Swiss-Prot record:
Pathway(s) annotated for this protein in UniProt: Cofactor biosynthesis; (R)-pantothenate biosynthesis; beta-alanine from L-aspartate: step 1/1
A Pfam entry, by short name: Asp_decarbox
Cofactor note: Binds 1 pyruvoyl group covalently per subunit.
Posttranslational modification: Is synthesized initially as an inactive proenzyme, which is activated by self-cleavage at a specific serine bond to produce a beta-subunit with a hydroxyl group at its C-terminus and an alpha-subunit with a pyruvoyl group at its N-terminus.
Active site: S25, Y58
Record's function text: Catalyzes the pyruvoyl-dependent decarboxylation of aspartate to produce beta-alanine.
Intracellular or extracellular location(s): Cytoplasm
Any single GO CC term annotated in Swiss-Prot or TrEMBL for this entry: cytosol
Protein residues bound to substrate: T57, G71, A72, A73
Name of the protein in its database record: Aspartate 1-decarboxylase
Residues recorded as bearing Pyruvic acid (Ser) in the entry: S25
Length: 115
């Protein structure tokens, strides 16, 4: 049996921009993408601490320190909102019990403070 389990998390990132006229996605700085063990086009869930919104989108590479929601997702956040970005993986139950997710903590400038 496979189950969904937390694979990666960027904890308490700050939204730096919201671009309604872009095709879609979340732009994340490359250093955070790598640190969180994410890849471009990977599905992620966004949890907005400020307004309680939870929604899915996909990752694209952005500028250093950038957390920008694009397209329709831009309507779900405000610049300055604190968000948690999570990705899940499907794996066998036994493997999932031993699996350790990648968790990256950032400061209010989206700089890594703890991995």
């Amino acid at each position: 049996m496979n189950i969904e389990i937390l694979a990666s998390k960027i904890h308490r990132a700050v939204v730096t921009d919201a671009n309604l006229n872009y095709v879609g996605s979340i732009s994340i700085g490359e250093e955070l993408i790598k640190a969180a063990n994410l890849i471009e086009n990977q599905k992620v869930e966004i949890l907005d601490i400020n307004n309680g919104e939870r929604f899915a989108t996909y990752v694209i590479k952005g500028k250093k320190g950038e957390i920008c929601l694009n397209g329709a997702a831009a309507r779900k956040v405000c610049v300055g909102d604190v968000v948690i970005i999570v990705a899940y993986a499907s794996m066998k139950f036994k493997k999932a019990k031993k699996f350790k997710p990648t968790i990256v903590h950032v400061n209010n400038k989206n700089e890594i403070i703890k991995e």
